[in-house]
Regions:
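A conserved acidic beta->alpha catalytic loop
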Residues: 40-49, 95-96
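Acceptor/aglycone-binding surface of glycosyltransferases and processive sugar-polymer synthases
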Residues: 53, 62-68, 72-82, 87, ...
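Hydrophobic helical membrane-anchoring modules
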Residues: 180-317
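Short beta-strand/loop segment that forms part of the nucleotide-sugar
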Residues: 20, 32-43, 64-65
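Cell-envelope/extracellular polymer assembly enzymes that use nucleotide-activated donors
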Residues: 2-4, 35
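Short, well-formed alpha-helical segments that are part of the catalytic scaffolds
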Residues: 12-27
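Acidic helix N-cap motif at the loop->helix transition within catalytic regions
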Residues: 14-18, 45-54
Length: 317
């Protein structure tokens, strides 16, 4: 199969019929074989009923329904797990991403042998203060910290080679940083393409200042995880051992000072330096334990269930 279209959504029932028809009109005009996978991330409107109707009328359309809202990253993860196309394209369900971009993204990723292409909404139809300015600040910080020079990390429309999305773990709120995750997995051929951004036609935006703040926190988390996520003992163990050694050395010095030098001086327990040394040793021990627990968590995380699927219109493996 040439293409898998992955569409995560939350309360977008009004948009789905138009979006689905638009995708079909664009792709039926090509010779590409494709599938469309909607992931309902715990919608409370009629989104799932609309997906069931689309599935009944088009055999290449599928749906996955979460038992509750788990977040966009988990929705993408579920879609990626089911995708079988050589190229996987993601887009949002709010009609602000134009399906007319899909054929061009497919042609370019194949022709230029890219690992992924990220969309760039160069001209936006969003609030200047509440979305455009925060988005520019966020993307600037992401570029500086990751070394990947994309203009729009959070753009919903992206195209990936299948091996890319099968090789990375999208977790937490890391959907914004899939290009960074891909680069750290060795997929460095990253392209960017200006895409059309349209004004929202139905519903209301899910964006808010809290998501903007979370984006920066996730960036810090990602930076740490990329360095130490698979080996937390390297970070916590090093600093824990260093702090314990410093604290122990200080306590040893105080003991030698009392026994051989300041014999008539204050008791060790009366000196504040002793409690500083003791605290440093305790913190070092706690850091070391944190590293050990982190190693246990890393070993177990692949066996944990990250989301619950309530219904599926596609065999889930």
């Amino acid at each position: 199969m040439n293409l898998s279209i992955i569409i995560p959504l939350l309360n977008e029932a009004e948009s789905l019929p138009e979006l689905h028809g638009w995708i079909l009109s664009e792709l039926n005009a090509t010779n590409l074989t494709f599938e469309i996978i909607f992931i309902d991330d715990g919608s409370t409107d009629n989104s799932w009923e609309e997906i069931e109707k689309l599935h009944q009328s088009h055999s290449s359309t599928y749906g996955i329904r979460f038992s509750k809202n788990f977040g966009k990253s988990q929705a993408l993860h579920a879609g990626f797990a089911q995708a079988i196309g050589d190229v996987v394209v993601t887009l949002d369900a709010d009609l602000q991403d134009a399906p007319s971009e899909i054929p061009n993204l497919y042609k370019r990723i194949i022709a230029e042998d890219l690992d992924l292409i990220s969309g760039w909404k160069k001209k936006r139809y969003d609030s200047l203060f509440f979305k455009n300015i925060p988005s520019k600040l966020f993307n600037w910080a992401a570029r500086r910290s990751s070394g990947i020079y994309l203009h729009d990390f959070n753009c919903g429309i992206k195209a990936y080679k299948k091996e890319v999305i099968k090789s990375i773990e999208v977790f937490g709120e890391m959907h914004r940083y899939i290009p960074v995750l891909a680069a750290h997995a060795g997929f460095n051929k990253i392209g960017e393409q200006v895409v059309v951004h349209q004004a929202r036609k139905f519903g209301v935006t899910k964006f808010g200042w809290i998501r903007f703040v979370n984006g920066f926190l996730d960036l810090i988390t990602l930076s740490f995880l990329n360095k130490f996520g698979k080996r937390p003992m390297h970070f916590f163990g090093f600093w824990g051992s260093l702090m314990f050694f410093i604290g122990f050395s200080a306590a040893l010095y105080l003991g030698i000072d009392k026994i051989y030098i300041n014999i008539d001086g204050r008791l060790i327990a009366e000196r504040p330096e002793f409690y500083i040394a003791l605290t440093t040793m305790i913190l070092g021990t706690l850091f070391f334990i944190a590293g050990f627990l982190g190693e246990l968590w890393v070993g177990q995380q692949n066996h944990s269930q990250r989301y619950t699927i309530k219904r599926s219109l596609k065999s889930y493996e």
